[in-house]
Amino acid sequence: MKFPGKRKSKHYFPVNARDPLLQQFQPENETSAAWVVGIDQTLVDIEAKVDDEFIERYGLSAGHSLVIEDDVAEALYQELKQKNLITHQFAGGTIGNTMHNYSVLADDRSVLLGVMCSNIEIGSYAYRYLCNTSSRTDLNYLQGVDGPIGRCFTLIGESGERTFAISPGHMNQLRAESIPEDVIAGASALVLTSYLVRCKPGEPMPEATMKAIEYAKKYNVPVVLTLGTKFVIAENPQWWQQFLKDHVSILAMNEDEAEALTGESDPLLASDKALDWVDLVLCTAGPIGLYMAGFTEDEAKRKTQHPLLPGAIAEFNQYEFSRAMRHKDCQNPLRVYSHIAPYMGGPEKIMNTNGAGDGALAALLHDITANSYHRSNVPNSSKHKFTWLTYSSLAQVCKYANRVSYQVLNQHSPRLTRGLPEREDSLEESYWDR
């Protein structure tokens, strides 16, 4: 487990030098592992350059997103392959991206649950999915299906306009019996997306998702929900509010989804409102930066050394140096908030907005899992006087999430190819020392 964020001292966590005082508390075997588990609609993003006639011939609407049938998708895919029009085939899916990015950042195990083609041809989209996923992401629990996984075609027309064609394939065929109880029982978090409970009638995915939530509750594993798009939420915000209240501990969203859910256009007020239902909120707000909101134990609150920020809640970041806790673990819960502007003002040229939020969530998951890992290895540490949810303060998690988002915005793919550099030039040292 690599530890999140930067720390000034070189060894802030006793891993290599075994402290004799720790020996008595630690088993002789390998230090206990920590991991996260996520359920996804297994999806491959296929990008191709086509002419306008191609888009018309398949009955697609230029510049829009349409769901297409499996046979149309197969014909379309075969034609793209024969004519060599495919420019990129990436593993996609919100949770797949998040698990991959978590494994790259933490250099540790994540587990992905979902479906995968039983027969995989070399060079096919399913093969690409496996190739583009970190080797630290455990794919051993995927359920085999007889047919295609999900495919999202991005067809770039002559004018550069993007048209999307989505073929769900068998991606929603995950059955409840394919959810491994022991894997969820030992996890630091269960990560889900709102798309999982919104499927066609008769598809087993929602039932599998609820089964996973049931296991998570049984073993006190925090459930993390990332909101899909504002349209899914806007259909029935009250239903989602109740769903969050009943099942979810950590919520990740962008400012549009936040407004659809809460009716508040200010991301800070929306995050505050969401604390009525969940324990911790991560809200990315594009060029404004990102917000976090959570609870801490009043007795253990820590004042910020950063300038106090104005906002809809005055001086809202006053206690941003506090670590987050779940509401039920607090004796006297206090709401705490933090905000950070985009790292280095954001990239000069944004290559890709798809996945910046998944990157930020992966950073938060890394911090939460590092906390579980530290607690199981150094249980009597003063860092665990209270039952904290995060290893670092809200302000520090914001910095880390922000840095990872920047990395994703700066590249073509939503998946990181390597972890963050140990030391950086540029503004780095002054940035982390702030």
UniProtKB/Swiss-Prot annotation:
Pathway: Purine metabolism; IMP biosynthesis via salvage pathway; IMP from inosine: step 1/1; Purine metabolism; GMP biosynthesis via salvage pathway
Phenotype when changing Q396A: Mutant is less sensitive to ppGpp inhibition
InterPro entries linked to this entry: Carb_kinase_PfkB-like, Carboh/pur_kinase_PfkB_CS, IngK, PfkB_dom, Ribokinase-like
Outcome of substituting S393A: Mutant is less sensitive to ppGpp inhibition
Record: residues binding ATP: T284, A285, G286, P287, I288, G289, G357, N402
GO biological process assignments: GMP salvage; IMP salvage; purine ribonucleoside salvage
Enzymatic class: transferase
A GO molecular-function annotation: inosine kinase activity
Cofactor(s), by name: Mg(2+)
Temperature dependence: Optimum temperature is 38 degrees Celsius for guanosine kinase activity and between 26 and 39 degrees Celsius for inosine kinase activity.
pH dependence: Optimum pH is 8.2 for guanosine kinase activity. Optimum pH is 6.9 for inosine kinase activity.
Regulation: Guanosine and inosine kinase activities are both inhibited by ppGpp, a nucleotide messenger universally produced in bacteria following nutrient starvation. ppGpp binds to Gsk, and inhibits its activity by blocking conformational dynamics and inducing tetramerization. Inhibiting purine nucleotide synthesis is required during starvation to maintain levels of the metabolite 5'-phosphoribosyl-1'-diphosphate (pRpp), which is required for the synthesis of histidine and tryptophan.
Details of cofactor binding: Mg(2+) is probably required for activity in addition to its role in forming the Mg-ATP complex.
Record field: catalytic activity: guanosine + ATP = GMP + ADP + H(+); inosine + ATP = IMP + ADP + H(+)
Entry EC number(s): 2.7.1.73
UniProt-reported outcome of changing K383A: Mutant is insensitive to ppGpp and GDP inhibition. Mutant accumulates abnormally high levels of purine nucleotides following amino-acid starvation, compromising cellular fitness and cell growth
Gene disruption: observed consequences: Disruption of the gene causes a considerable amount of guanosine accumulation together with a slight increase in the inosine productivity.
Residues annotated as binding GMP: D40, Q41, T42, L43, V44, D45, G93, T94, I95, G96, N97, R198
Assigned keywords, A-Z: ATP-binding, Kinase, Magnesium, Nucleotide-binding, Purine salvage, Transferase
The protein's assembly and partners: Homodimer.
Recorded family membership: Belongs to the carbohydrate kinase PfkB family.
Role noted for this protein: Catalyzes the phosphorylation of guanosine and inosine to GMP and IMP, respectively. Can also use deoxyguanosine and xanthosine, but not adenosine, uridine, cytidine or deoxythymidine. Shows a strong preference for guanosine. dATP can serve as a phosphate donor as well as ATP. Shows weaker activity with UTP and CTP.
Protein name per the record: Guanosine-inosine kinase
Species name: Escherichia coli (strain K12)
Lineage: Bacteria, Pseudomonadati, Pseudomonadota, Gammaproteobacteria, Enterobacterales
